[in-house]
C-alpha cells in the first residue's frame, strides 16, 4: 500500500529548490510543456533506483555542481524518507543514499546504494523490473497492446523472471561441465594413482616378514647373552667393590704411625698416675667456683637494674600530668560520640527529606495527569452521543444506497421509466452517498477508538483520592523532618595522642615499679665473694693440674682406639686379597662389547621394520582414501544428475512454460475483473503466444485484435492488463504514474478517459497523472500546478 507523500527537489533540471505534496487517490500534475512535470515524476524513480533508472548527469540543473532528491513514502501506516545526493565531478558521483523510518524516533535502515535497493525491494516490493508496469511515459500508456507479440513475450518473460530462469539454466549447464571436467576427472586421476601404489603392498609385506624373523633370532641371542651377562655383572660389581675397599684400607694403614701412638700412650698413663693424688681437692674447688659465679651474677644484675630505674621519678611526674589530661579527654569523648550520633541522624533525615521531596514532586505530576484524564472522561458522553448520530446517518445512507444499487432504466419505487439525465443524477447521488458513507464509517471507527481509549480512565477518581492522601502523608513527614535538618551540632575536636601517651606512660611506670622491687630483693642477698676468691687462690696451682685429668683420659682412649683400628685394617686386607679374581674384569669387558653390538643390530632391524610398517599403513590409508574418493565421485555424479534434471525442468517445455501459462490464465481472469470496472462492452483474451484480443459482450464469437481498438479502449485494456500483472506479482495497491496519457486525443476522448481515471482510483492506492490538459481536472482530485 505504498504511496508517494512528498518530493523535494534541489537543482534538478528546471527546479532549484521545490517541494511537492501528493495524496492518496488521483493526483494531477498540471502545467504547460517545459515546466518540469516529467522531471518531477522521473525524480521519484531516480530517488528509488538512482543511476539504475536513468543517466543521472542529465538531470543536473545547468551551472550547478550538486543535486539532491528527497522522497517521502507511506506504507502500512509507516512513513519513510529516501534521500539521494550527487556531486558533479567528471561524472555524477553519488555521495548520499539513505532510507529512514521517520515515525516518532527516526531509525536509519540503509546508508548506501545497494542496501537501499535491497530495502526498497524488501519493504515495498519495488525493483527496476516493474517500472514499465507502474510508470507509463508519454505515448506509452498503450504499449502493452501495441507492441509486437514477440517483444511482448520477451518483456513478459523478464517481468515474470523467466529470463532469469533461462540465465540460471545456462549457469547450471556451465557448472555441470566444470564438475565433469574438473572435480570428477581429478578424482578419477587420483584413484588411478592410488591403485598403482596399492600394488607395492605385497612386496613390502614379504620384506617385513624377513626382517621380523631376523629380529626374533637376534632377540633370542640377546636373551641368552643377558642371562650370562647378569651373572657376570654381579661378580664384576663385587670385584670392583673389593678392589676399591682394598685401596681405601691400604691408604688408611699408611696414614697410621704405630710407634708414635704407642709412645704417646705410655706418656699419658704416667701423667695420670701423678694426678690421682689430687682427687680430694675436687669438691672444694667446685664449691668455691660456684660461689664466685653466683656473686658475679648478682653484681651484674644490680648494675643493670640501677640503669633502668634511674629515670623513674621523671616518668612518674609525666604520668601524673597526662593522667589529668586523659580524664578530661574521656569527658570530651563522650560529648563527641553524642555529637556524632546527632550528625548521623541529621544525614539520615536529609536523605529521607530529599527522597520525600522527589516522591512529592512525582505524586504531584501523577495527580495532575490523573486530573487531566478525569477531565477527558467528561468528553466521553459527547463522543457517545456523536457516535449514535453517525450510526443513524450510516443507516439512512445504507438504505438509500440499497435503493439506488440496482437502478437501470426504471424507478425502484414506482417502476416508472427514468430519463438518462435522471439516471446520471441518481448515479452521481449514489457516488456522493458512497463517499459520505466511507467518510462517516472512518469517523465512526475513529470515535470508537477514542471512546475505548477513554473508557480505561473510568475509576481513576479512587486512584486520585489514594494518591492525594499519600501526598498529605508525605507533606506531614516533611514537616516532622525539617527541624532535625535545621539542628546546629557543635564541632568537637579530640587530641587522639593523649590516650596513646597515657597508655605508654602507664606501661613504663608499671614496668619500672616492678624493677625497683627486684632491685631491693637483690640488694638484700648476702654474697661472700672476697672470702671465696682468697681460698680459691690458695688451692689454684693444685687445681690447674687436676683439671687436666679428663682431657688426658679422653686423649688416651682415642689413641687406644686408633691402635685397635690399625690391627683391624690389617686383618681385613688379608681377607680381601684372598677373594680377588682378575679374570672376571677381562671377561666382563668382552661380554659388554658383544651386548652393545647386538643391541645396535636389533635397533637397526627395528628401525627398518618400523619404516616398512609405516609404508604399509600409508598404502592401507590409500584403500580408505580410494573409498572416500569413489564416494565423493558418486556424490558429484548424483549432483550432476540432479542438475541435469533441473536444467531439463528449466527448458522451454518445463517450468518457464508452466509459469507463463499459469500467469496468462491468472492475468486473463484478473484483467477481465478490472476491465469490467472500466467498460461493459468487451471481454479481454490473452493467448499463450501473448496475442491480445477484445471480445464484444454482445457477440462473444467475434474477436478483435486489441491493437485495432480505439485510443481510449486501448488505454483501458492496457491498464487492466498492467493491474492484473501487478496483482500476479503480489504488488496490489501500488502507486501508478501516467505521463501525458491524453496526448493526440481530442476533447471528447479526453473526457471519456477522465471517467476511466475516476474508476482507476478504486483499483490503485495512488495514481499520479502528468498532463497539460485542464479537462482532466474534475475539481475533486489533488492538483500539483507547475
Swiss-Prot record:
Disulfide bonds: none annotated. One of its GO terms (molecular function) is ATP hydrolysis activity. Its cofactor is Zn(2+). Residues 194-249, 337-455, 551-650 form a coiled coil. GO terms for biological process: double-strand break repair. It comes from the Archaea. Binds 1 zinc ion per homodimer. It holds the Pfam family AAA_23. SUPFAM superfamilies: P-loop containing nucleoside triphosphate hydrolases, Rad50 coiled-coil Zn hook. Zn(2+) binds at residues 411, 414. Residues 366-459 form the Zinc-hook domain. This is DNA double-strand break repair Rad50 ATPase. It comes from Nanoarchaeum equitans (strain Kin4-M). The gene is rad50.
Amino acid at each position: 500500500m505504498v504511496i508517494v507523500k512528498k518530493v523535494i527537489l534541489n537543482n534538478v533540471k528546471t527546479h532549484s529548490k521545490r517541494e511537492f505534496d501528493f495524496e492518496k487517490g488521483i493526483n494531477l500534475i498540471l502545467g504547460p510543456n517545459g515546466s518540469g512535470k516529467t522531471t518531477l515524476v522521473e525524480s521519484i524513480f531516480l530517488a528509488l533506483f538512482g543511476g539504475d533508472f536513468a543517466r543521472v548527469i542529465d538531470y543536473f540543473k545547468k551551472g550547478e555542481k550538486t543535486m539532491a532528491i528527497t522522497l517521502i513514502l507511506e506504507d502500512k501506516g509507516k512513513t519513510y524518507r529516501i534521500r539521494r545526493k550527487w556531486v558533479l565531478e567528471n561524472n555524477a558521483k553519488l555521495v548520499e543514499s539513505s532510507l529512514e523510518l521517520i515515525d516518532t524516533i527516526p531509525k536509519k535502515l540503509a546508508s548506501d546504494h545497494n542496501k537501499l535497493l535491497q530495502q526498497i525491494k524488501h519493504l515495498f516490493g519495488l525493483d527496476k523490473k516493474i517500472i514499465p508496469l507502474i510508470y507509463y511515459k508519454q505515448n506509452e500508456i498503450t504499449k502493452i497492446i501495441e507492441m509486437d507479440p514477440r517483444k511482448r513475450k520477451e518483456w513478459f518473460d523478464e517481468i515474470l523472471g523467466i529470463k532469469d530462469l533461462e540465465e540460471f539454466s545456462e549457469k547450471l549447464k556451465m557448472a555441470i561441465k566444470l564438475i565433469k571436467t574438473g572435480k570428477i576427472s581429478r578424482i578419477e586421476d587420483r584413484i588411478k594413482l592410488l591403485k598403482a601404489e596399492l600394488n607395492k603392498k605385497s612386496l613390502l609385506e614379504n620384506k617385513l616378514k624377513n626382517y621380523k624373523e631376523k629380529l626374533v633370532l637376534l632377540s633370542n641371542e640377546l636373551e641368552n647373552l643377558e642371562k650370562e651377562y647378569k651373572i657376570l655383572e654381579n661378580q664384576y660389581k663385587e670385584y670392583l667393590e673389593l678392589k676399591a675397599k682394598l685401596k681405601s684400607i691400604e691408604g688408611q694403614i699408611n696414614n697410621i704411625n704405630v710407634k708414635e701412638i704407642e709412645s704417646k700412650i705410655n706418656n699419658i698413663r704416667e701423667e695420670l698416675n701423678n694426678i690421682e693424688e689430687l682427687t680430694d681437692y675436687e669438691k672444694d674447688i667446685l664449691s668455691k667456683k660456684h660461689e664466685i659465679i653466683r656473686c658475679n651474677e648478682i653484681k651484674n644484675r644490680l648494675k643493670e637494674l640501677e640503669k633502668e630505674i634511674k629515670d623513674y621519678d621523671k616518668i612518674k611526674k609525666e604520668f601524673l600530668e597526662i593522667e589529668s589530661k586523659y580524664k578530661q579527654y574521656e569527658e570530651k569523648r563522650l560529648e563527641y560520640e553524642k555529637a556524632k550520633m546527632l550528625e548521623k541522624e541529621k544525614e539520615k533525615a536529609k536523605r529521607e527529606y530529599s527522597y520525600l521531596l522527589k516522591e512529592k514532586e512525582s505524586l504531584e505530576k501523577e495527580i495532575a495527569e490523573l486530573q487531566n484524564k478525569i477531565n477527558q472522561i467528561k468528553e466521553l458522553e459527547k463522543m457517545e452521543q456523536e457516535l449514535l448520530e453517525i450510526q443513524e446517518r450510516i443507516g439512512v445512507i445504507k438504505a438509500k444506497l440499497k435503493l439506488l444499487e440496482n437502478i437501470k432504466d426504471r424507478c425502484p419505487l414506482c417502476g416508472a421509466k427514468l430519463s438518462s439525465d435522471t439516471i446520471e443524477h441518481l448515479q452521481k447521488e449514489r457516488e456522493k452517498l458512497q463517499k459520505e458513507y466511507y467518510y462517516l464509517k472512518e469517523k465512526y471507527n475513529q470515535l470508537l477508538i477514542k471512546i475505548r481509549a477513554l473508557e480505561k480512565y473510568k475509576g481513576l477518581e479512587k486512584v486520585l483520592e489514594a494518591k492525594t492522601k499519600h501526598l498529605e502523608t508525605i507533606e506531614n513527614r516533611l514537616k516532622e523532618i525539617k527541624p532535625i535538618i535545621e539542628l546546629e551540632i557543635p564541632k568537637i575536636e579530640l587530641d587522639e595522642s593523649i590516650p596513646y601517651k597515657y597508655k605508654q606512660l602507664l606501661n613504663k611506670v608499671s614496668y619500672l615499679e616492678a624493677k625497683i622491687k627486684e632491685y631491693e630483693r637483690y640488694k638484700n642477698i648476702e654474697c661472700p665473694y672476697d672470702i671465696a676468691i682468697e681460698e680459691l687462690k690458695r688451692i689454684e696451682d693444685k687445681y690447674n693440674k687436676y683439671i687436666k685429668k679428663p682431657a688426658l683420659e679422653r686423649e688416651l682412649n682415642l689413641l687406644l682406639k686408633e691402635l685397635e683400628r690399625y690391627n683391624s685394617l690389617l686383618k681385613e686386607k688379608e681377607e680381601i686379597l684372598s677373594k680377588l679374581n682378575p679374570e672376571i674384569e677381562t671377561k666382563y669387558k668382552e661380554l659388554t662389547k658383544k651386548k652393545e653390538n647386538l643391541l645396535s643390530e636389533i635397533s637397526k632391524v627395528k628401525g627398518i621394520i618400523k619404516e616398512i610398517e609405516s609404508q604399509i599403513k600409508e598404502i592401507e590409508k590409500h584403500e580408505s582414501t580410494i573409498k572416500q574418493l569413489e564416494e565423493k565421485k558418486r556424490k558429484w555424479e548424483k549432483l550432476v544428475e540432479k542438475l541435469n534434471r533441473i536444467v531439463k525442468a528449466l527448458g522451454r517445455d518445463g517450468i518457464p512454460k508452466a509459469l507463463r501459462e499459469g500467469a496468462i490464465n491468472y492475468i486473463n481472469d484478473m484483467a477481465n475483473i478490472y476491465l469490467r470496472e472500466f467498460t461493459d462492452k468487451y471481454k479481454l483474451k490473452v493467448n499463450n503466444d501473448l496475442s491480445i484480443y477484445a471480445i464484444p459482450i454482445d457477440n462473444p464469437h467475434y474477436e478483435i485484435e486489441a491493437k485495432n481498438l480505439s485510443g481510449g479502449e486501448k488505454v483501458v485494456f492496457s491498464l487492466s492488463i498492467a493491474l492484473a500483472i501487478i496483482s500476479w506479482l503480489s504488488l496490489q495497491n501500488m502507486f501508478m504514474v501516467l505521463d501525458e496519457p491524453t496526448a493526440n486525443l481530442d476533447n471528447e476522448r479526453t473526457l471519456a478517459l477522465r471517467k476511466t481515471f475516476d474508476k482507476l482510483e478504486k483499483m490503485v492506492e495512488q495514481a499520479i497523472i502528468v498532463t497539460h490538459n485542464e479537462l482532466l481536472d474534475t475539481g475533486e482530485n489533488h492538483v500539483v500546478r507547475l
